[in-house]
Amino acid sequence: MLPKRASFLVSVATIPLLFGYHAIGILMFTVIAFMMQFFRDPDRIPPSDEDLIIAPADGRRLSGKIDRIERVGSDYPLIDRIFPDGSGGILISTFMSPFDVHVNRAPVSGKVIYTEHVDGRFQVARSRVLTENEKNLIVIKTDYGNVGVIQIAGFVARRIVQYVKEGEYVERGDRIGMIRFGSRVDLVLPENCEVLVKTGSRPMAGETVVARFNPGKKRVNVQ
């Protein structure tokens, strides 16, 4: 069943058809279908194990996928806001195509201790644009360490929306923001996490397990 707002828009789009303006009616239906596809926000069910880390972004349609998994040092942009002690972390970067769900979700449960919006350019998000593109950082404190989610704008995606504020507690899988018309989301984890996905994986935000907290392990090999 269509949401009430969508049903209303469909009803409006039928008016030109009733008066013989078929081209206008078809155009309106096309625009409405696109907006419904883009702004869809399906429910997701996260796993129950508290040590699991889930994908913050979708990467399932067409070119959407996890395209970077690597260890990053203390010189990586914004990482000092995530790990103030100067340590490095593990980066899992997901490219979102314009056809993916664009709502971003909390990868872990914890307290939002820091957020920062950084103005910048709007280059294609496939390149290494973290230093230049507009971005938004959300840092979540957990019992296992801090986790950072970096929403990055791109050539098409020119608006980042943040749903949470500093001081709020989020549950894993909660909606924390949105990037309109695709782009990329970088997930930065503590070094002792165990990565459970590979480059090329196609995650589902709020459900796909991408890593596991492993506080007893000092170092994890990342390929």
From Swiss-Prot:
It is a peripheral membrane protein. The active site is at S183. GO terms for biological process: phospholipid biosynthetic process. The lineage of its organism: Archaea, Methanobacteriati, Methanobacteriota, Methanomada group, Methanobacteria. Is synthesized initially as an inactive proenzyme. Formation of the active enzyme involves a self-maturation process in which the active site pyruvoyl group is generated from an internal serine residue via an autocatalytic post-translational modification. Two non-identical subunits are generated from the proenzyme in this reaction, and the pyruvate is formed at the N-terminus of the alpha chain, which is derived from the carboxyl end of the proenzyme. This is Putative archaetidylserine decarboxylase proenzyme. Its main location: membrane. GO terms for cellular component: plasma membrane. It catalyses: archaetidylserine + H(+) = archaetidylethanolamine + CO2. Transmembrane segments: none annotated. The gene is asd. It holds the Pfam family PS_Dcarbxylase. It is found in: Cell membrane. The record marks G182, S183 as: Cleavage (non-hydrolytic). It is an enzyme of class 4 (lyase). Catalyzes the formation of archaetidylethanolamine (PtdEtn) from archaetidylserine (PtdSer). InterPro entries: PS_Dcarbxylase, PSD-A.
